[in-house]
A protein has these predicted regions:
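N-terminal membrane-entry
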Residues: 201-221
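Intracellular coupling helices
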Residues: 227-241
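Structural preference for long, well-ordered alpha-helical segments in enzyme cores
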Residues: 1-4, 90, 167-171, 216-219, ...
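Membrane-helix interface segments
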Residues: 31, 160, 208-209, 239-241
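Mid-to-C-terminal secondary-structure elements
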Residues: 38-54, 66-206
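Short amphipathic beta-strand/extended segments in non-transmembrane regions
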Residues: 1-54
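Short, glycine/charge-rich beta-strand/loop segments that flank catalytic centers
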Residues: 15-23, 63-64, 87, 92
Length: 241
């Protein structure tokens, strides 16, 4: 992310997000069913500006032990919306090289709820928990953007998607310096949203054709209702005559 911003000044900001698969346990030891957890850089709060019920999202994402949860997650698992101060135990696995072999080692970490996101508000994204993403964890993705990482670019006023995309693929100095392989493509978030691609779990997916069809049906029903109203009104008027 830092490399791209330095190489291309039209990129105003970049937010990196990682799909973090972990088991969640409450302070009581009770295991919480699957929830979508994403580790994100603190500027997530600035780029997406989700509505909050409580807490400071940016400060929470700066805190390695802080976690932000959604309203629906809090209500479903705690029976109330404001659960600031509650603790969650996140259990995951990390790979370490030992005796020439990669081994999975279980790791546990306690997080404190420091922000509540109002997921009733409109958003392109879907998640249950947001936690801090250390810069060291996404060092590889600064240039490759792979391994379940999402990179969201914010362009400045003079920035254009097509021009930046061309630069990314033609700037030999940048590509050689960071060993870029293959073609890099940029997609507007709204385009991904309406693509109907169910494989992108972090971004909500809507089928544009289905939305148009539903809208057309709604308009047709409204038109029919209007005609029926007019016919009934005319019939009553004729009866009075």
């Amino acid at each position: 992310a830092v490399a791209i911003q330095r190489s291309f000044p039209e990129v105003e900001d970049i937010c990196v997000c990682h799909d973090d698969h972990k088991q969640i346990k409450k302070n009581s030891g009770e295991t919480i069913p699957y929830a979508a957890i994403y580790a994100v850089t603190p500027n997530f709060a600035d780029l997406f500006q989700p509505e909050l019920l409580a807490g400071d999202l940016k400060e929470t994402l700066r805190d390695p032990s802080g976690v932000a949860v959604t309203r629906s997650f809090a209500r479903k698992n705690f029976g109330r919306e404001n659960i600031l101060g509650e603790t969650l135990l996140l259990v995951g696995y990390s790979q370490y090289l030992k005796d020439g072999r990669l081994q999975n080692v279980e790791e546990e970490k306690v997080y404190m709820v420091k922000a509540i996101v109002d997921d009733k508000s409109k958003s392109y994204l879907q998640y249950d928990l947001l936690i801090h993403l250390p810069e060291s964890d996404y060092a590889l993705t600064r240039v490759s953007w792979v391994n379940s990482y999402y990179s969201f670019l914010k362009l400045g006023k003079e920035g254009r998607k097509d021009k930046l995309e061309k630069k990314l693929n033609q700037d030999e100095t940048y590509r050689k310096q960071y060993d870029i392989q293959g073609k890099q493509q940029l997609r507007p978030l709204s385009q991904v949203y309406f693509s109907g691609d169910q494989q992108i779990g972090f971004i909500k997916s809507r089928d544009r054709v289905a939305l148009y069809l539903a809208g057309s049906i709604a308009i047709a029903i409204l038109v029919i209702a209007c005609f029926n109203y007019i016919n009934i009104s005319m019939t009553k008027s004729l009866q009075r005559l």
